Amino acid sequence: MLEKCPIIALDFSDLASVTTFLEHFPKEELLFVKIGMELYYSEGPSIIRYIKSLGHRIFLDLKLHDIPNTVRSSMSVLAKLGIDMTNVHAAGGVEMMKAAREGLGKGPILLAVTQLTSTSQEQMQVDQHINLSVVDSVCHYAQKAQEAGLDGVVASAQEGMQIKKQTNEHFICLTPGIRPPQTNQLDDQKRTMTPEQARIVGADYIVVGRPITKAENPYQAYLEIKEEWNRIK
């Protein structure tokens, strides 16, 4: 498994913004970064090549969700980019997730997105017509992802402990929606935890965006979050 360091969400719209942000970090500080839809759709595969040229690891967060054959073919293309981690939507079903695994191969970590951290209990039941608790829905998706041969899931840290109980010991739980203790603004995230809390309940990786990218001193903010994350072994 890759080193369990905090993953920085590069939620920017273009390469210029990314390079400006990365200038805050010493060149010897090798990072694990998340490239999402906005940046990837803006810059294309060239952003992957640029980030890899700097020695950083990449979580390509595109959340694929389509028919199995399309997902298989798409993953085979992404595998050639040299990414370290990527994902699909668990709602696509076991066959789609199996196809994603086949297309990606055995190198990069493949995760399934369960319920977004912006989704509340009420939204899930009303909009998705899922009459379960959030934790039961997330754990159901986690079990299906494991059945499909995926490496883990993306889920709120609030469900981390239950995921660990209902899957095998090597099954990864990556948690977004991480906020330092001093952060009061939750933005659009509804199910959040601090880095230390997430580690305690079983998170293997955390994704942190605005608390680092919007900080006055991004490198210092990153170091503080990394220190808190590593406080628990």
Swiss-Prot record:
Cited CDD domains: OMP_decarboxylase_like
Coiled coil ranges: none
Pfam families: OMPdecase (PF00215)
EC number(s) reported in the record: 4.1.1.23
InterPro entries the record matches: Aldolase_TIM (IPR013785), OMPdecase (IPR014732), OMPdecase_AS (IPR018089), OMPdecase_bac (IPR047596), OMPdeCOase_dom (IPR001754), RibuloseP-bd_barrel (IPR011060)
GO CC annotation terms, alphabetical: cytosol
Residues bound to substrate: 11, 34, 61-70, 117, 179, 189, 209-210
Top EC class for this record: lyase
Pathway assignment: Pyrimidine metabolism; UMP biosynthesis via de novo pathway; UMP from orotate: step 2/2
UniProt keyword terms in alphabetical order: Decarboxylase, Lyase, Pyrimidine biosynthesis
SMART domains: OMPdecase
GO terms under biological process: 'de novo' pyrimidine nucleobase biosynthetic process; 'de novo' UMP biosynthetic process
Residues at the catalytic site: 63
Catalytic activity: orotidine 5'-phosphate + H(+) = UMP + CO2
Gene Ontology molecular-function annotations: orotidine-5'-phosphate decarboxylase activity
Membership in a protein family: Belongs to the OMP decarboxylase family. Type 1 subfamily.
Subunit organization: Homodimer.
Stated role: Catalyzes the decarboxylation of orotidine 5'-monophosphate (OMP) to uridine 5'-monophosphate (UMP).
NCBIfam families: PRK00230.1, pyrF
Identification of the protein by name: Orotidine 5'-phosphate decarboxylase
Species name: Streptococcus agalactiae serotype V (strain ATCC BAA-611 / 2603 V/R)
